[in-house]
Amino acid sequence: MAITKIHPIKSTLNLAIDYITKSEKTDEKILVSSFKCHPSTAHIQFMKTREDNDTKGTVLARHLIQSFLPGEVDPIKAHEIGMELCKKILKEDYEFVLATHVDRGHIHNHIIFNNVNYKTGKCYQSNKKILPQN
């Protein structure tokens, strides 16, 4: 069963995205996907969405980590599960970058998504009750 945690990113958004998309962690970036942005420029797109919607909050993005038990899933299946989670909780309303890490004893997904809904301009409301425990 996957364990999911989420926390806010209030600064260094570019460094967080750079970290999760590192080649050595993501099987040479094969296990990196994104929605409404390109991973290498996602931090710029996130900030543009904030500016376009005149958002003033301190949270720039959210970092969701989805961890699997050793041997529970293979890297491709973990990435697919991460995409399903993004569709379920973000509903194609938030730009995101998904990276599946395979450099540790357990496979895990990192999802960094914009705190601002690119359609409505409203900020994401974090609610642990909506995060599934796959």
Language-model region placement:
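N-terminal nicking endonuclease/strand-transfer module with a His-rich metal-binding environment
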Residues: 1-134
